[in-house]
Amino acid sequence: MEQEQDTPWTQSTEHINIQKRGNGKQTQKLEHPNLTQLMDHCLRIMSQVDMHKQIVSWKQWLSLKSPTQESLKTRVLKRWKSFNKQEWTS
């Protein structure tokens, strides 16, 4: 079997303990030592997807060629840059 790339998902799902009881039956116990990592990973991915959607919509809006929007473009770009700085520092 090929070794999968180690991700929080595979790490958490691979932690299955098979224990034998006194009567010979096997029980499986699923442990989640990396559940926090998995949740962090999911939140990070969701945040990146959200950020990508925002960037695409802003770029589409900014690509409009109406001359009356030049001042708005400047204002939005300034806000976008400050928003971006806040995102990277948090």
Curated annotation (Swiss-Prot):
Give the InterPro entries listed for this entry: Flu_proapoptotic_PB1-F2 (IPR021045)
Give an example GO biological process: symbiont-mediated suppression of host cytoplasmic pattern recognition receptor signaling pathway via inhibition of MAVS activity
Q: Where are the annotated segments for Mitochondrial targeting sequence?
A: 65-87
Compartments where found: Host mitochondrion inner membrane; Host nucleus; Host cytoplasm, Host cytosol
Q: Which Pfam families match?
A: PB1-F2
A single Gene Ontology CC term: host cell mitochondrial inner membrane
Mind listing the UniProt keywords for this protein, alphabetically?
Answer: Apoptosis, Host cytoplasm, Host membrane, Host mitochondrion, Host mitochondrion inner membrane, Host nucleus, Host-virus interaction, Inhibition of host innate immune response by virus, Inhibition of host MAVS by virus, Inhibition of host RLR pathway by virus, Membrane, Modulation of host cell apoptosis by virus, Viral immunoevasion
Functional note? Plays an important role in promoting lung pathology in both primary viral infection and secondary bacterial infection. Promotes alteration of mitochondrial morphology, dissipation of mitochondrial membrane potential, and cell death. Alternatively, inhibits the production of interferon in the infected cell at the level of host mitochondrial antiviral signaling MAVS. Its level of expression differs greatly depending on which cell type is infected, in a manner that is independent of the levels of expression of other viral proteins. Monocytic cells are more affected than epithelial cells.
Q: Family, per the entry?
A: Belongs to the influenza viruses PB1-F2 family.
Recorded protein name is Protein PB1-F2
Source organism of this protein record = Influenza A virus (strain A/Seal/Massachusetts/1/1980 H7N7)
